[in-house]
Regions:
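Mg2+-dependent prenyl diphosphate-binding active-site environment of isoprenoid biosynthetic enzymes
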Residues: 1-204
Length: 208
């Protein structure tokens, strides 16, 4: 990948070693921000427990049981014709885990109860899959100037994608299904669902 958001990627500008260090530094900074917030809390009761749970959600998503394992699967999928089940598992652990962590952490800090957290988790998992499906679709049908990144990169790298395993019609149906599942998950449990509903719709409509 040479471009992201219309600019050259970190490793193309500064080299792979500096890019890896930048990633390590940013991840450590995220932990620093979260733990500093916890350490400065005067209230050692419910409020600090919410912060710990939110931080744990993010750390777990970035760790060996989620993003790291998903990335290993992605690397090993090169030149393989993986099943749709394996592809979905990989993206649940990568993109899906990070998006879900952001949603659940936010809900936890806002005081969501257990039932609401389950609903937000389901929303995040489905949105994560939709995000990747749309991304795969745009990689073969989008414009690099509009997207701000290289296209056909997955094909060149012989990666297994949703577009490689499904017809355009099947992929569109799956995008609609997971979008609807995400929206239904938070119906009746989210006080102000409009923003999250719009996010789901906008993501689906992004691919036309």
């Amino acid at each position: 990948m040479k471009y992201r958001r219309g600019k050259k990627t970190n490793h193309k500008v500064f080299g792979e070693a500096m890019a890896i260090l930048a990633g390590d530094g940013l991840q450590a900074l995220a932990y620093e921000v979260m733990l500093s917030c916890i350490a400065k809390s005067d209230n050692m009761g419910y409020e600090i427990l919410k912060k710990i749970k939110a931080a744990n959600e993010i750390v777990m998503a970035a760790g060996t049981e989620a993003m790291v394992s998903g990335q290993v699967m992605d690397i090993n999928s090169c030149s393989d014709k993986d099943s749709l089940t394996m592809l979905e598992k990989m993206h649940r652990m990568k993109t899906g885990a990070l998006i879900t962590a952001a949603v659940v952490a936010g809900a936890t800090l806002a005081g969501a109860d257990e039932r609401q957290v389950v609903a937000f988790r389901k929303y995040g998992e489905n949105i994560g899959l939709v995000f990747q499906m749309v991304d795969d679709k745009l990689d073969v049908s989008g414009d690099s100037r509009t997207l701000g990144k290289d296209i056909h990169a997955d094909e060149r790298n012989e990666k297994t994608t949703y577009t490689a395993l499904l017809s355009p019609e099947e992929l569109d149906d799956l995008i609609r299904k997971h979008t609807q599942d995400a929206k239904e998950a938070i119906e009746g449990v989210c006080v102000c669902p409009q923003g999250l509903m719009k996010l789901a719709d906008d993501l689906m409509l992004r691919c036309g």
